[in-house]
Every structure is written in structure tokens, then in C-alpha cells.
A protein has these predicted regions:
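Extracellular/periplasmic envelope-modification machinery, especially enzymes
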Residues: 2-3, 229, 254, 316-327, ...
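Membrane-interface helix/loop caps of multi-pass membrane proteins
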Residues: 2-356, 368-374
């Protein structure tokens, strides 16, 4: 997300663009604040709008200078440093100080890695590699939002050169730009369903959005006229386009779940808005409002500072923040943006204008980057740690080691990534006679109880895939999971086991919305009916939710001073949502001749759930991250399941 380095207002369209920046920013802010009275489930689409705006503005600036024969690539990169670096430097500096004061050492170590990647402007690669299935909640990552900055800066590395060559072939400008856009869009559509993380974070799959802005820039300025004879029509079309975008972001999950095509619709509506906005008299006047203009002018810095503010607010309150605290974070975001703009960005630009030379600006950039890197190293050095662990706290936090996934048989019968049906998974299935044995299917929440169940069950079979629910294809599922479950259904039809267990993180599957719950309920009902059809004698069990804590249970225990003693309980913030999805799915299971195994009823008293359990005399937290069971937790939950199916 960035703004035009040339803030000339010789055209009213610049004011309109600031108004559009304000809209895009507010969508993102409200999405991350997650106000209970206004849940903008599609607010993240504001970043898509920023990509379009960036392509639009950057192309305009470069093309004008190419026509004037005044364009120098060195000048372009210097302008990028002057525009982007001061706000980023101050944000990283302040964020690092607060991280040192508030975060636990293990959290600091993760933060430092993201700090290094953000300083190098490749944080999108870092978060792509580390936003895996077992990564901490993004709500507790102060720099997660800088991925978009990484995408844009990587685009800026090659785009001036590309546009210069395109300028030399001006006769074919539009055709060449369409080739870039179509290639990126095609790859995005091809991979988005099966590889949503990589297509979210990496430039090749975002280039099409930026090139929409590039093409719009060339189209609008080539066809621009000063006439306003069609202003009424333009206002109507632009207004409808804007309302369409707002409707999508407000009711995103009501309209389409896991739909990459909704991105296309949003970008198309935004393109329509940009095209007609140049003649839309009344909408331009609205967007020229002083408050909207101010928000747009501060959009870059406000975007930078909002996520750290929200993260530290959550950490300081153990994840529990109210609507008024969210509103306070919103006000603080704009206050900090104004301070940074007046106290840092504006003076730095004035200095850069006076300094003139490339090497001075570059030297400041290099020196500041080195300072940030040194700061990151220093705050994560145990000798300088603000928080000192006790021996007991070190013991608790040792359970956050993701190596626990080894006990889930990851890579063997618990899969991730692409799925290819075949005999390669035969070892995951017992060779018991038809009509006997137990099958377990689902996502990681099925996998995490597989090992202890295998020890207690004769003729036990298990196959799971991360992020794949044991459900028939629906708007909640993706193609790789549909193929996976089709394979599972074939095995059920072949062997017709005595018992079939379906496990999943159902709350995540419903996306936390009432509409998602409706889709999930219908899908589960259809799945149970399908299994009854192909294996009429099989008994079907649906494994319920397990407790979850954010960002992870060991950190919550350390912050709340909970000792590692068997039987300790810790409050679950989203217990109402967990128990709500349990109640709904238990009804669905009962109505379709299946048994629902309610884990929460056995582990929780009201909203306080069992947080410490023992295995072989050793106490362990129930889960090692937010919701995946430790070895002791596996056996505890497996005991509940075993009692229900015996």
C-alpha cells in the first residue's frame, strides 16, 4: 500500500484518489478491529483496492516523465525511499520497543524474524513460509500486514524497467499490458483453490490487480475529457459500483465462501468506479470532503501502525478486547499517523528535496535499515530481555514446540498439500474383514487423536488431511479436499467398517458466521446420509470441538500465572462460539442417526476448560498452540472418544 510520490493537485482526480484510499483504508481497519456491531468479513478486500490504486498512480507518474524525457530509474527508487521509508522506520522502531516490553521471549524471537524480513521488504515471503497450519494466530503478529508492502516493493523493482520498454513500443502498449494482466490472472485462478496461501502472499498472483490499475491509468488519461454532460450517468454508475464494493465487504461470507471470484468482482467494480469517477460530479464532491481527504492522506502511515496497536492491545488484555477498546485503537491509529506525518514524513521529504543527491537518501535508508536490524538482534538477545523466565515458565513454554505434530503421523497418514489417490495410502488402512474395524477421517483435529485411538482399537484405520473436513463438496470445501474425501468415501464403500469417526475443527469450518454454520450443518447432514447410503450398517460418530486459546495455551498460562499442575483450568474466550457450533452439529447428527461426541462437556465447566493434563506422571498443557493437542492432551481426549464408541 503506498501513495503517489507526486501530490500535485492539478487534476481533481488526485483528490478523488485520496478519497478512494480513505475507503480502502477504512475497510481494512474495520476488518482488523472486528467490531461486533459491524463485522466487515470482506474488509481485507481493501488491500486489493490499494493494489489497483498503486498501479494507477505509479503508471501515471512514470509515463508522464517518459513522455517528457525526464524519467530516471534512480530518481524513481529515491522517490520510493522518500515516500515509504520514514513511516516504516518509525513504525518498526516503535513496534520493536513495545514488543520488547510486552512480548514473551519466544514471541520476540518470532517477531524478530518478521522484523528482518520487513526491513528487507520481503515479509510476504516470510509470512507465506510461516503462516502454516500450526502457526500462531495472525491476530498476534504485529507485522503481518506488511506483506502487502513487500508485494508492492517487489513490483516496483521491475516495473519501471518493463514500462520503459513498453513505452518504446507505444503502438502496442495496451496489448502488452493485457498480456501481463491475463497471465497473472490465469495463474491466480488456476492455483487459488488448492494453494490459497501462496496466491495470497506472493507477487505473481497479485500482479493482475496492479495491472488493472496500470491499464486504467493509460485508458483514463488517454480518453479523458473535461465535459460533464454525462455527470448524472457517471454518478449513478460510480455510486452503484461503490455500493457494490461495500455490500460485498459487509456481507462477504453471506455471498460466497472461499470464492476467489469475489476478488474479481470487487476489482471489476473498483475499475468501473475509477472509470466513471472522472465525470461523477457529486461523488467527486463527497470524496473531496476534508475529513475523507485527511484520512486518505494519512492512509499509508495509518495502515502501518494499526496492526501493532491492535496486537499489543490484545496481548495486554490476554486476547480479550471490547468494542470501546477497539474504537480506542482506531483513534490511536489516526493520532499516531498524524504525529508521524507531521513529525517525521514531512520533515524527511523537505530534507530529501534539499539534499537532492541519490547517495545521501540511499545512505540514510541503509543506515536506518542497519539500525532496525541491530535493534531486532538486541531485543531478542536473552541478556537484554525485559521478561525473564522462571524455571517453571520455561517448562510450560517448552510445549509450544511444533515437533508435537510428529505424533500425528504427519506425512504418513496425516497429509498436507496436494493429494493423489492410489495404493500409496494402503498402510493407513487395516486389512480387517468387511464390516469390522474403525475408520477415522477429517483434518488435523482428527489426526491429533489417531495415535491413542489406534492403541486402544482393533483394526483401526486413519487418514486425514490438514484443513480438509470430512464433508461432501460444498461452498466450504476446496478441490483438493473434495478429491481427498471422495477417496475416503470409496474406502468406506469397499470395507464398510463397523464404526466411522468424523473429526474436524468445525468452528473454523463455519468461518465463525451464522451463514457458515448453516452451510456446515447442511453439508454434515448430507455427508452422514451419503455414508448411510454406501455403508448402511456402519455406526457414525462426529467428534466435537476441543477448547482453544489464543495465541496459544502455554503463553496464556505464563501470562496468567497458571501453574503446570494436573487439573488446572483456564478461561476460554470464545467458549460461546465453540459450544454454539457443538449444539448445532449435535442436533444435526441426532437427526441423521449419528452420534455426536461432545468433548467440551467432558473438559469444561462453564467457560473454564481443563488446561493441564498428565500422561505417565508428567503434566502437560492440553494443547501446544491454540487448539492442537499435546501428547497428554491426545490421550485425554481419546479416552473420552473411546468411552463414547465402546
Amino acid at each position: 500500500m503506498s501513495a503517489d510520490e507526486n501530490r500535485s493537485e492539478t487534476h481533481g482526480r488526485i483528490k478523488a484518489l485520496d478519497g478512494l484510499r480513505a475507503i480502502a483504508l477504512l475497510l481494512v481497519l474495520f476488518y482488523h478491529c472486528n467490531f461486533t456491531f459491524l463485522p466487515l468479513h470482506g474488509g481485507f478486500l481493501g488491500v486489493d483496492l490499494f493494489f489497483v490504486i498503486s498501479g494507477f498512480v505509479i503508471t501515471r507518474g512514470i509515463w508522464q516523465r517518459l513522455e517528457d524525457k525526464t524519467f530516471r530509474i534512480a530518481d524513481f527508487y529515491q522517490a520510493r525511499i522518500v515516500r515509504l521509508y520514514p513511516g516504516l522506520f518509525i513504525t518498526l522502531l516503535a513496534t520493536s520497543i513495545f514488543a520488547w516490553l510486552i512480548m514473551l521471549p519466544r514471541e520476540l524471537a518470532s517477531y524478530a524474524q518478521s522484523l528482518y524480513s520487513t526491513t528487507g521488504l520481503f515479509s510476504n515471503f516470510y509470512f507465506w513460509r510461516h503462516s502454516s497450519y500450526f502457526s500462531p494466530s495472525v491476530d498476534y503478529l504485529p507485522l503481518i500486514h506488511t506483506w502487502s508492502l513487500g508485494v508492492e516493493e517487489q513490483f516496483y523493482l521491475f516495473f519501471p524497467v518493463v514500462l520503459t520498454f513498453i513505452f518504446l513500443a507505444r503502438k502496442y502498449t495496451t496489448q502488452i499490458l493485457w498480456v501481463f494482466l491475463t497471465a497473472s490472472l490465469g495463474v491466480f485462478l488456476l492455483l487459488a483453490s488448492n494453494y490459497p496461501v501462496i496466491t495470497f502472499y506472493l507477487l505473481p498472483f497479485r500482479t493482475w490487480e496492479i495491472f488493472v490499475g496500470v491499464l486504467l491509468s493509460r485508458y483514463i488519461y488517454r480518453n479523458h475529457t473535461t465535459t460533464s454532460q454525462n455527470s448524472s450517468v457517471a454518478d449513478a454508475v460510480a455510486g452503484i459500483s461503490l455500493l457494490g464494493i461495500l455490500a460485498i465487504t459487509i456481507d462477504y461470507q453471506q455471498i460466497a465462501i472461499n470464492s476467489t471470484y469475489l476478488q474479481l468482482v470487487t476489482v471489476a467494480l473498483f475499475a468501473s468506479l475509477l472509470i466513471f469517477l472522472q465525470h461523477a460530479k457529486y461523488l467527486q464532491a463527497i470524496l473531496a470532503n476534508n475529513l475523507i481527504q485527511k484520512i486518505g492522506a494519512l492512509s499509508y502511515v495509518a495502515y502501518l501502525v494499526h496492526q501493532p496497536i491492535l496486537v499489543f492491545l490484545r496481548l495486554a488484555n490476554n486476547g480479550k478486547i471490547s468494542n470501546w477498546q477497539r474504537f480506542l485503537a482506531l483513534l490511536l491509529t489516526f493520532a499516531m499517523a498524524e504525529i508521524i506525518w507531521r513529525g517525521v514524513e514531512k520533515p524527511f521529504r523537505n530534507w530529501a528535496r534539499i539534499a537532492g543527491s541519490d547517495w545521501r537518501v540511499t545512505s540514510v535508508f541503509a543506515g536506518g535499515s542497519a539500525l532496525i536490524l541491530l535493534l531486532g538482534f538486541t531485543i531478542t538477545n536473552s541478556n537484554f530481555a525485559f521478561h525473564k523466565y522462571t524455571v517453571a515458565e520455561k517448562k510450560i513454554l517448552s510445549f509450544t514446540d511444533p515437533s508435537y505434530v510428529i505424533s500425528y503421523e504427519y506425512g504418513k497418514c496425516f497429509l498436507g498439500g496436494a493429494f493423489a489417490a492410489g495404493n500409496v495410502y494402503n498402510n493407513c488402512f487395516s486389512q480387517s474383514p468387511a464390516g469390522t474395524g474403525t475408520f477415522l477421517f477429517g483434518d488435523s483435529h482428527a489426526a491429533m487423536v489417531a495415535v491413542p485411538l489406534k492403541e486402544s482399537q482393533n483394526n483401526f484405520s486413519f487418514l486425514a488431511h490438514s484443513g480438509c473436513f470430512a464433508l461432501l463438496p460444498s461452498r466450504l470445501t476446496v478441490p483438493v479436499c473434495d478429491s481427498f474425501f471422495a477417496y475416503e468415501l470409496n474406502r468406506i464403500e469397499e470395507q464398510k467398517p463397523e464404526r466411522i469417526l468424523l473429526g474436524g475443527n468445525w468452528l473454523e469450518g463455519s468461518l465463525g458466521t451464522s451463514y457458515g454454520e448453516k452451510i456446515l450443518s447442511k453439508s454434515l447432514a448430507a455427508t452422514i446420509k451419503k455414508i448411510h447410503q454406501i455403508a448402511p450398517a456402519s455406526k457414525i460418530y462426529v467428534i466435537g470441538q476441543t477448547p482453544e486459546w489464543s495465541p496459544n495455551l502455554p503463553s496464556v498460562m505464563v501470562r496468567e500465572k497458571v501453574p503446570l499442575q494436573d487439573g488446572q483450568r483456564v478461561s476460554v474466550e470464545n467458549f460461546a462460539a465453540l459450544s454454539g457450533i457443538d449444539a448445532r452439529l449435535e442436533t444435526v447428527a441426532g437427526q441423521n442417526d449419528a452420534t455426536y461426541i461432545n468433548i467440551l462437556n467432558s473438559l469444561c465447566e462453564s467457560s473454564k476448560c481443563l488446561a493441564v493434563v498428565a500422561k505417565d506422571g508428567v503434566n502437560q498443557p492440553l494443547v501446544f498452540d491454540s487448539n492442537h493437542l499435546t501428547q497428554a492432551g491426545e490421550f485425554k481426549v481419546a479416552t473420552i472418544i473411546q468411552a463414547a464408541i465402546s
